[in-house]
Amino acid sequence: MTIDNPSAFLKTLPTGSGVYQMQDAQGKVIYVGKARNLQKRVSSYFRRQLDSKTQAMMAQVQSIQTTITRNENEALLLEASFIKQFRPRYNVLLRDDKSYPYLYLATHQKFPRLDFYRGAKKAPGRYFGPYPNAGSVRENLALIQKLFKLRQCSESFFKNRTRPCLQYQIKRCTAPCVGYVNEQEYRRQVEDAILFFEGKNDQVIIKLTERMEVASENLVFEEAAHYRDQIRQLRRLQKQQIITGGKGNIDIIGIAESNGAIGFAILFIRSGRMIGHKPFFPNTPLGTTLQTALVEFIPQYYLSPLRNGDIPERIVTSEPLEDRLWIQRALSSGLNRKLAITDQKRAPYKQWQAMAALNAAQALSQHLAQKNTFALKLEAIQKSLALPNPIARIECFDISHTLGEATVASCVVFGEEGPIKKDYRRFNISGVTPGDDYGALRQALTRRYVRLKEGEGILPDVLLIDGGMGQLRQAAEVLEELQVSGVILTAIAKGPGRKAGLEKLFVWGRREEIHLPADNIAFHLIQQIRDEAHRFAITAHCNRRAKRRVESTLQEIEGIGPKRRQKLLKYFGGLQELQRASIEEIARVPGVSETLAKAIYDACHQHKG
């Protein structure tokens, strides 16, 4: 509803709970808010005394839409949904577009494998986490291997060993592949590892102590020494990682502000152990208070499908949380589980609240420093290439194929803070003569910039092509055909002998090549962007090529017709999951024998990589 007459408009608003959307002259949603009393809350925006941030926003508001909800909890959940849908510029916007990794234990296998895992939890077994990043997973994986010596190798590697691998030599595995440990003893290691993951270190230590005493009585001193070392390591870890006052799953959220920017850090406590932390730097309108940022951050973060159902029993914040009980009730309702939120600085969480806040401040400081560094590098590119305007966004394209097979184009995007990975795109090229790089590039550029011209995204200031003047000419022709203007076209070509540091740069509209010194910071960033486009293209190409070859090989297996092939893919949820499956898992598909399962497994792994 338009607000030409605010007084009349406000009288029409209900006094119950709901959500309001503020829209600009183009009908774009620029802010979403929740309210216990819609009339009272929206009226507050029409008072004389408003802070500068709210004044700037209200100057753009042309209409306000309201949605009535049955209760306050629904209002909070709907607000989070609308923020995710509309991405309003005056809301705090969480930029977290990656699912979280886990440690996966294949407990259904005879000798269970422990490995890194990311994605939907479809495969049978136990999942431990989530961990804040891949580094935390690998660190804990190394720790578990050191303590309990569980195998990490793939099924194909495991079943074809005739002698122990390096992991056995460095005492990170007991070599079940060649029978150096029996199933019963290995299962005991697995059970100990599960207890460790669950935070039941005391139980593990009791078991290990009993085994150490038995080994000593039987004069098996080497085995006793092994158990003694395990016990020492576990006790050392207990001192380092255990939280005073509980062994549950807790997220501790720290928040910090610097020069108008706001950063968060979450400490992840799982089964009483801190398994790592992760920083977040949401898009925050200038003038946003810490309390407002915290109130908007928490629902967005915990209601995201990327959480994959992994919600702690308790959330602890380093700053007071407005509407704490409201948010607690709404999240418990929306997540269908009991959740407690603590914001008071008292034992046993006080030291962890301080640590979370310190981590947030440090991460924010580093983030701002990196942002400033990137801004300086973009400025250096502008000066080095003598470009007329400042650069805020660069897109780079590369083409990858193997003798014309499975051609893929990549587009990577860099901004003032570095890579913008959510805007990366890859294009599977079709209908082009194999090996025709010009044709592939034209197709990718056309597909990309048709969408951008139609308003789906942001045009870059600079378009960088991995190639020479030929590729640059293709880009110029495509943009001219699409009537896209205002984009500077550049290219980076290999130098003599394809040596790094000798590359040539081209700018469309200029005849001369540009050679920058090898130590020039602008040159380093251009190389970095080109290399990232190359990496992204090669990864996509290898995946596409492997998928094609596996699909082709599946068609050649006797007993696998179109219907059974579709049945397999539907059962596992896609080719990637089928490739991950073991022979035993494939044999569980109705109508697939163990012999056929082995043939399928071999076909899936014949062309990996």
Swiss-Prot record:
Cellular component annotations (GO), alphabetically ordered: cytoplasm; excinuclease repair complex
GO MF entries: DNA binding; excinuclease ABC activity
Residue span, GIY-YIG domain: 15-92
Signal peptide: none
Keyword ATP-binding: no
Similarity remark: Belongs to the UvrC family.
Function: The UvrABC repair system catalyzes the recognition and processing of DNA lesions. UvrC both incises the 5' and 3' sides of the lesion. The N-terminal half is responsible for the 3' incision and the C-terminal half is responsible for the 5' incision.
Protein name per Swiss-Prot or TrEMBL: UvrABC system protein C
Gene: uvrC
